[in-house]
Design a protein with these regions (language model features):
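Positively charged n-region of N-terminal signal peptides that target proteins for export
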Residues: 1-4
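Surface-exposed, active-site-proximal loop segments in enzymatic domains
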Residues: 113
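Predominantly the C-terminal beta-signal and adjacent terminal strand-loop region
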Residues: 375-377, 381
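Structural detector for internal amphipathic alpha-helices that build alpha-solenoid repeat scaffolds
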Residues: 32-35, 40-56, 75-98, 107-108, ...
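Bacterial N-terminal signal peptides
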Residues: 6-15
């Protein structure tokens, strides 16, 4: 029995070796014929090889075809048959996953301007480029250049950019996240945006870390969009969302913009980040929320933000549940009390919100100034709120 099994294994090995030799001979025959054939016959050779039983072994032939087209790049625009050769070669390299052909396919990608050939080449690179940093980097740079082109008002070829986006999604490398994120938010149109979004979410790795990279390193509009994506994501914990929001608030507080649009984006990002921190009661961010309040008060005085923004900011500080938050809100109440004592007009809603947050914080640091409201010309509603806040203070 044992001897029979050994004989069977030996026979199978011999058959496999013979088949491999046969496949190699067939490949060599195809390659010799391709080298001497006319363009029409070259196309027929590739078609026969792709449809034959040994198609899986024909990688070097299809690479030879791609190299032939690249070597004759100056003639490609004069004869459509070159494009046909390139498309068959690139597509088959991708189908069989012939990794040795990836650099030839990239050379073709750079050499041709034909959209269909570019799309076929991109599709192949999405397979044979797996694990190859150079191929991934090349595709990243190309998509980034098309994003820049689109942002300037020019429209890249939709089929080509779609194929490149899909290729990056298949490759799934974290280095592609920034360019795919840009593509999602560029306004390519619903169909291309959906392709970009699918590719983005196919990227492997730490989603929070990739969003952090966008918030730290990409242009202002993308920083804001990355923050929004983080807050809305169901892939991140509340702690991760809060950490990203804290970073975004730090950046938006300490960055500058030369134009009105940039300043508006920074302001929007501040309020978005503060809201995200308040919703998660992220007390670690108290210093940034205090700085945010100081900036918001100045903007409110200049008419740059409305009352709701100021109220939201005070509520965000109240959500921090820290002594420092109570100290800053008490300082604000001192200022309002001073204005009121001098007969200046006050906003009931602003005063009420300060007092309500001091009550929620329950810090006795506010005692004296909450008491002082009872001696000023505030409305009965404000005084009642102050008494309620006093009752909540912890001793």
């Amino acid at each position: 029995m044992r001897r029979a099994l050994c004989m069977m294994m030996a026979l199978l090995g011999a058959v496999a070796a013979a088949q491999a030799q046969d496949a190699q001979k067939i490949l060599e025959t195809f390659r010799r014929n391709f080298a001497i054939a006319s363009l029409d016959v070259k196309i027929q050779i590739l078609q026969d090889a792709a449809g034959g039983k040994t198609a899986a072994d024909m990688g070097p032939l299809f690479q030879q075809a791609v190299d032939f087209v690249t070597d004759n790049a100056g003639l490609v625009s004069t004869d459509a048959r070159f494009n046909q050769l390139a498309e068959i070669g690139a597509e088959q390299i991708g189908k069989m996953g012939f990794a040795a052909g990836r650099y030839s396919v990239w050379k073709l990608f750079k050499a041709t301007a034909d959209p269909q050939t570019l799309a076929k080449a991109a599709g192949a690179l999405g397979v044979v480029g797996a694990g190859d940093p150079e191929t991934i980097s090349n595709l990243n740079r190309y998509v980034d250049s098309q994003n820049t082109l689109s942002a300037s008002g020019k429209a890249p070829d939709g089929a080509v950019i779609a194929a490149c986006l899909q290729a990056l999604g298949k490759l799934g490398d974290p280095s592609s996240f920034p360019v795919l994120f840009s593509a999602v938010n560029l306004g390519y149109g619903d169909q291309l945006t959906a392709v970009a979004r699918n590719a983005l979410f196919a990227i492997r790795g730490d989603f929070a870390a990739m969003l952090l990279g966008v918030i730290k390193d990409r242009p202002l509009p993308e920083k804001k969009l990355a923050l929004q994506m983080a807050i809305d994501s169901d892939k991140l914990t509340d702690d991760k969302k809060a950490q990203l929001a804290e970073l975004a608030l730090d950046i938006s507080l300490h960055s500058s913009a030369a134009d009105a649009a940039g300043k508006g984006t920074l302001r929007d990002m501040r309020f978005l980040a503060a809201a995200g921190l308040a919703a998660r009661k992220w007390s670690h961010a108290t210093p940034f929320i205090i700085e945010h309040l100081d900036m918001t008060i100045g903007e409110f005085d200049k008419g740059l933000v409305d009352r709701n923004h100021l109220l939201d900011t005070m509520n965000a500080l109240g959500a921090m549940s820290t002594h420092d938050a109570a100290v800053r809100l008490t300082q604000f109440l001192v200022l309002i009390n001073s204005y009121t004592e001098k007969g200046k007009a006050y906003d009931d809603q602003i005063v009420f919100t300060v007092i309500a947050n001091l009550g929620a914080l329950g810090d006795k640091v506010a005692f004296d100034d909450l008491m002082y409201t009872q001696y000023l010309t505030y409305s009965a509603t404000v005084k009642k709120a102050a008494r309620a806040a006093l009752d909540k203070l912890k001793w």
